[in-house]
UniProtKB/Swiss-Prot annotation:
Keywords: Coiled coil, Cytoplasm, Stress response. Interacts with RssB. One of its GO terms (cellular component) is cytoplasm. Pfam families: Anti-adapt_IraP. The keyword rRNA-binding does not apply. Residues 1-36 form a coiled coil. The lineage of its organism: Bacteria, Pseudomonadati, Pseudomonadota, Gammaproteobacteria, Enterobacterales. It is found in: Cytoplasm. Belongs to the IraP family. Its main location: cytoplasm. GO terms for biological process: cellular response to starvation. It comes from the Bacteria. This is Anti-adapter protein IraP.
Length: 86
């Protein structure tokens, strides 16, 4: 029983570490996208936003991906492009 608990705690710690790493990657990408958008001319910025939105619109999600997940991704991309980090 102790071995099982120790094994589960180890797996939990590994998952937490993976989660932290993914969060750091997302934060880094947000910072980069924000910096790029801020340094673009307004018309270039708008063109990029339209291209990304167009690409998202054309993508047909896999049937195994829940609609909620797809909508979450679309909303997050929209938020990042239209309201970059402060």
């Amino acid at each position: 029983m102790k071995n099982l608990i120790a094994e589960l705690l180890l797996k939990l710690a590994q998952k937490e570490e993976e989660s932290k790493e993914l969060c750091a990657q997302v934060e880094a990408l947000e910072i980069i996208v924000t910096a790029m958008l801020r340094n673009m001319a307004q018309n270039d910025q708008q063109r990029l936003i339209e291209q990304v939105e167009g690409a998202l619109y054309e993508v047909k999600p896999d049937a195994s991906i829940p609609d909620d997940d797809t909508e979450l991704l679309r909303n997050y991309v929209k938020k990042l492009l239209k309201h970059p980090r402060q």
